[in-house]
Amino acid sequence: MSALEKSMHLGRLPSRPPLPGSGGSQSGAKMRMGPGRKRDFSPVPWSQYFESMEDVEVENETGKDTFRVYKSGSEGPVLLLLHGGGHSALSWAVFTAAIISRVQCRIVALDLRGHGETKVRNSEDLSAETMAKDVGNVVEAMYGDLPPPIMLIGHSMGGAIAVHTASSNLVPSLLGLCMIDVVEGTAMDALNSMQNFLRGRPKTFKSLENAIEWSVKSGQIRNLESARVSMVGQVKQCEGITSPEGSKSIVEGIIEEEEEDEEGSESVNKRKKEDDMETKKDHPYTWRIELAKTEKYWDGWFRGLSNLFLSCPIPKLLLLAGVDRLDKDLTIGQMQGKFQMQVLPQCGHAVHEDAPDKVAEAVATFLIRHRFAEPIGGFQ
């Protein structure tokens, strides 16, 4: 059992404090982490997985936007990686190390607008059209009129944006397309329960370690190694009131105080600031993006996606966590041989984080089969 597989198994443990000497409650020497040791939830820097980082400036009618990219590799095709909603380019960190060791390629992992360290003027416009244009603009800003061969790989929302980018011909040198665990039918069905899922998440975290621990124990990311680098891109330090409940109680207190004595506003404001500071001190981290507020764009990401994917006239790969995720259009397309499909069981939705080696093998095999890239170290 590899270290990654151990992490995946550990990630499925029920939510409870880690036990010294076992890394959890599973029996067997193989699962042990050494006497007296606890699982390490400390964050890991991006530089352990990527070679460099760049902020790419994109000019448009209203000014400049800055997109964060993480890069590795110097030869071969560019794999342009697009993360899922709420995640960041750092979700591709462990996959990047795995794919770079298998084939000659270059990695460009992009923080989409509203996510990670990307800074745009209108971060709330997360329409498929806008984000697809962003991808094309970043490629143009990085490579000019002669971009290298590029394969788009996207997970969930990022997979949908990859398809919209490809179908709109926004990347002229596109040679391949890969979607990871995103299917129109399944995605559309899931939208109804998405708000409930988001409401069930913690609003704030006491520390980065606390956020990483939650992501693994909740099953959002089943691979501890990936969670330690990925969650840094999902949360940020709070700037104002960190808890909606805290905000509500503070506002109600202000209203009551003003009704009783309008002249007491100075003391109320002082108390409000003190309450804010206490909240920030106790739970200084929150989500970088409020996904619940992006609901109006969800339908546009996924509706018609299957036919858009099938109509792209380039080699295509679909990686799924379960075969039950296929919808009717993709089932027919798969039977007709219009794309290559691989199911990676025992994964959660974040397939490329839960099983980065297996995803890297699938992508590397796809690249070699189509003669897009050369193998490294005897990989076949």
Curated annotation (Swiss-Prot):
Which residues act catalytically here?
A: 156, 181, 349
Post-translational modification note: Phosphorylated by SIK1 following increases in intracellular sodium, leading to dissociation from the protein phosphatase 2A (PP2A) complex and subsequent dephosphorylation of sodium/potassium-transporting ATPase ATP1A1.
Going by the UniProt record, its keywords in alphabetical order are: Hydrolase, Methylation, Phosphoprotein, Serine esterase
Q: Which Gene3D superfamilies match?
A: alpha/beta hydrolase (3.40.50.1820)
One example of the protein's molecular function in GO is: protein C-terminal methylesterase activity
In-chain residues carrying the UniProt-annotated modification Omega-N-methylarginine: 16
**What are the EC numbers?**
3.1.1.89
Q: Where is the composition biased (Acidic residues)?
A: 255-265
Residues modified to Asymmetric dimethylarginine: 16
- Basic and acidic residues bias (residue ranges): 268-280
Q: Region (Disordered) spans which residues?
A: 1-38, 255-280
PROSITE patterns in the record: LIPASE_SER
Q: Which InterPro entries match?
A: AB_hydrolase_1, AB_hydrolase_fold, Epox_hydrolase-like, PPase_methylesterase_euk
Q: Which Pfam families match?
A: Abhydrolase_6 (PF12697)
Phosphoserine carried by residues: 15, 42
Q: Which reaction does it catalyse?
A: [phosphatase 2A protein]-C-terminal L-leucine methyl ester + H2O = [phosphatase 2A protein]-C-terminal L-leucine + methanol + H(+)
Q: How does it assemble?
A: Binds PPP2CA and PPP2CB.
Indicate the family of this protein.
Belongs to the AB hydrolase superfamily.
Q: What does this protein do?
A: Demethylates proteins that have been reversibly carboxymethylated. Demethylates PPP2CB (in vitro) and PPP2CA. Binding to PPP2CA displaces the manganese ion and inactivates the enzyme.
What is the protein named?
Answer: Protein phosphatase methylesterase 1
Please report the organism this UniProt entry assigns to the protein: Bos taurus (Bovine)
